[in-house]
Amino acid sequence: MPKTINVRVTTMDAELEFAIQPNTTGKQLFDQVVKTIGLREIWFFGLQYQDTKGFFTWLKLNKKVTAQDVRKESPLLFKFRAKFYPEDVSEELIQDITQRLFFLQVKEDILNDDIYCPPETAVLLASYAVQSKYGDFNKEVHKSGYLAGDRLLPQRVLEQHKLNKDQWEERIQVWHEEHRGMLREDAVLEYLKIAQDLEMYGVNYFSIKNKKGSELWLGVDALGLNIYEQNDRLTPKIGFPWSEIRNISFNDKKFVIKPIDKKAPDFVFYAPRLRINKRILALCMGNHELYMRRRKPDTIEVQQMKAQAREEKHQKQMERALLENEKKKREMAEKEKEKIEREKEELMERLKQIEEQTKKAQQELEEQTRRALELEQERKRAQSEAEKLAKERQEAEEAKEALLQASQDQKKTQEQLALEMAELTARISQLEMARQKKESEAVEWQQKAQMVQEDLEKTRAELKTAMSTPHVAEPAENEQDEQDENGAEASAELRADAMAKDRSEEERTTEAEKNERVQKHLKALTSELANARDESKKTANDMIHAENMRLGRDKYKTLRQIRQGNTKQRIDEFESM
């Protein structure tokens, strides 16, 4: 039995290991990968490897894996990557896994600066990436530093602004909070809808020369071929849609494109190496095939996939709505519980206050009772003294009469009797005054006692009212092929039909232009980052982008502009570059 070969395939978020036979073809390995990860939109993807010369190459599906220039390592290493890009992610990418694989690959290209992304867009994209990873922002869970382990912005953007890690996190967090209620899958799609408007998104660049020998860039993408000047890969100067091309071929380093317009000359350029022309041919054929397919009715398979995706999305939305409803109910129950606890605490505090007031009133009552007793004792003492004084007065009266009688009996001298009479009269007068004073004091004590008695009655009534307040009960708790590398020439006929005239891509607008919310966010971020920007660290791409913005250009306006005039005019323009 032939010895098996170990293979390791790295997708954007997983590592897969397989054991293949020496006669296993590229297609068999590819099919095994897509089956393992559950991917059905296979036409966008391919398997990439590093050949023995160090170049990254796409695995040919119609040849044996071992017959290709794969480095003889163990295991054999491959990357599962998007080879072709959709025109419109929201219309073409059906499965969640397809969207996620594109999201992860595009995000990596942006972070590595393989796709130029302006700072304000980079921050907004970062917030969608965070929403897709963490879901809704929750201050109880997402504490300060929760993004410390995430790579979210291109190094260029970090170096161009005088902001530390915490300040970047604060800005991304603000926009993360803005996405509350957005499904993670929707955040992935929103990221891609904005990213697909970036000028370098989905473009494969190749260094070429025209007949004059001018060094230029050829950009191959989902919409056609574009020509760029050597120092500007953001702004194409000439464009040829796939619908204008009928044949592509190369002979060694010379590449020839034959337009559908018979009056137009051939479009000829030169690549530095034969292998580059092979790769250009393969990309042209694949992108042209997908361009034509999009302009035809969906196949039964695609219709079924879309129907299934709609059903799955509807199911997720229902589940989400159910979860949100349960969450709201739980939050309401928590709030109600907190309210009851708060009311309970307030009532307990009120009860405590009433108890303190009752205790204080009781103490005052006891004090008033004690004082009333003291006053009663004082009154009795004053009354007793008054009675004593009255008795003494009576005795004095009797003594006076006795003296008078004695004077008669003893016949004392008039002077002595007068003296004694004067003394007795003075004594009687003093006693009378003392008696009146004591009676007055007794009356005063009687009035004070009466007032105390009234206060006592009033306090007893208040106490009775306080004690009668009812007790408050406690509340209840609640996925063509590159040509054979041995051939120095190859040709491909790019079939066209009535659908070829459909150039609807020229009518497209950017997500920021369509979506007021995105437009508003980008405007706010531009303003917010302006003060922290270090102008001395601007790159050539930054300056090109700024100039394009100043002139009101975007990816689709530029596309319309570079396709103006007939094919011959544009080819002549290319030759004169």
From Swiss-Prot:
One term of GO molecular function: actin binding
InterPro entries, per the entry: Band_41_domain, ERM, ERM_C_dom, ERM_FERM_C, ERM_helical, Ez/rad/moesin-like, FERM/acyl-CoA-bd_prot_sf, FERM_2
Positions carrying Phosphothreonine: 558
Annotated compartments: Cell membrane; Cytoplasm, Cytoskeleton; Apical cell membrane; Cell projection, Microvillus membrane
Modification Phosphoserine, positions: 74, 407, 527
A GO CC term assigned to this protein in UniProt: pseudopodium
Modified sites of kind N6-acetyllysine: 79, 139, 165
Membrane topology per record: Peripheral membrane protein
Chain spans, region Disordered: 375-409, 466-518
Domain FERM: 2-295
N6-succinyllysine: modified positions: 83
Record remark on domains: The [IL]-x-C-x-x-[DE] motif is a proposed target motif for cysteine S-nitrosylation mediated by the iNOS-S100A8/A9 transnitrosylase complex.
Biological role stated in the UniProt entry: Ezrin-radixin-moesin (ERM) family protein that connects the actin cytoskeleton to the plasma membrane and thereby regulates the structure and function of specific domains of the cell cortex. Tethers actin filaments by oscillating between a resting and an activated state providing transient interactions between moesin and the actin cytoskeleton. Once phosphorylated on its C-terminal threonine, moesin is activated leading to interaction with F-actin and cytoskeletal rearrangement.
SUBUNIT field: In resting T-cells, part of a PAG1-NHERF1-MSN complex which is disrupted upon TCR activation. Interacts with NHERF1. Interacts with PPP1R16B. Interacts with PDZD8. Interacts with SELPLG and SYK; these interactions mediate the activation of SYK by SELPLG. Interacts with PDPN (via cytoplasmic domain); this interaction activates RHOA and promotes epithelial-mesenchymal transition. Interacts with SPN/CD43 cytoplasmic tail. Interacts with CD44. Interacts with ICAM2. Interacts with ICAM3 (via C-terminus). Interacts with PDZD8. Interacts with F-actin. Interacts with CD46. Interacts with PTPN6.
Protein name as it appears in the record: Moesin
Annotated source species: Bos taurus
Organism phylogeny: Eukaryota, Metazoa, Chordata, Craniata, Vertebrata
